[in-house]
Amino acid sequence: LAHVATSLELVATTTALEPALVLPALASPPADTLSLIERRRSVRAYADRSLTLGEVAGVLRRSHAREPSLSRATRTHVIANRVAGMAPGVYRYDPATGGLALSRAGAQGLESGRAGLDQDVVAGAALTVAVSFDRASLRVEGARAYRQAFIEAGIIGARLYLGAGAEGLGGCSVGAFYDEELAHLIYAGADLLV
C-alpha cells in the first residue's frame, strides 16, 4: 500500500469488471481461532501444486467474514496462477457476493513477482492477494480515512493468514513492491491506491 505521493504515475484507465465466478460456500467447519493464531507462521516455500477453488473460497471468505471495522475503502485483488477450476488471471473479490470479477486474463506469476521486487515467494505462489484503496471512499470517510484504511488492510492481512491456516495452507505477507507495477497489474486505475 502506498500513498499517492509515492507514485510516479497513476494508471490512467480503469476497466469495467464483469463477474467471472462466485466462490463456493465454506466447506470446512469453523476452525478454533486461538489454535490458528498459535500456529500462525509465514511460509516462504510452497508445495508445487494447484489450490482448489474450495481452498481459495475458504481463505477469502474467512478473511472478509465480518464487515469492515474502520474503513470501507479497501479493495481486494486476487492474482490466480494455479487454482483448479479458475482461469489464471487477476480478479477483484467482492466480499458481499463472494464473487470474483476478472480484470486481466492469463497467468501473471512473472508480472506479480516483478511487482513484488522480483521475489520468488511472489512469482511462485499459486495465489497472490493484493489490497488497494478506493480514493472516492477515502474522501467520503474523512480526515482519518487514510490511516484507518491502512489499519483495515492490516486486519485483512491478518485474517488472510488465519484463513490460510484454517484451510491447511501457508502464506507470506509481502510489503515490499513497486507501486506502479502493482497498480498496472491489478488495473488499479486513477481511483485506487495500491
Description of each model-found segment:
Residues 1-153, 167, 175-194:
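N-terminal accessory segments that position/regulate proteins before the catalytic core
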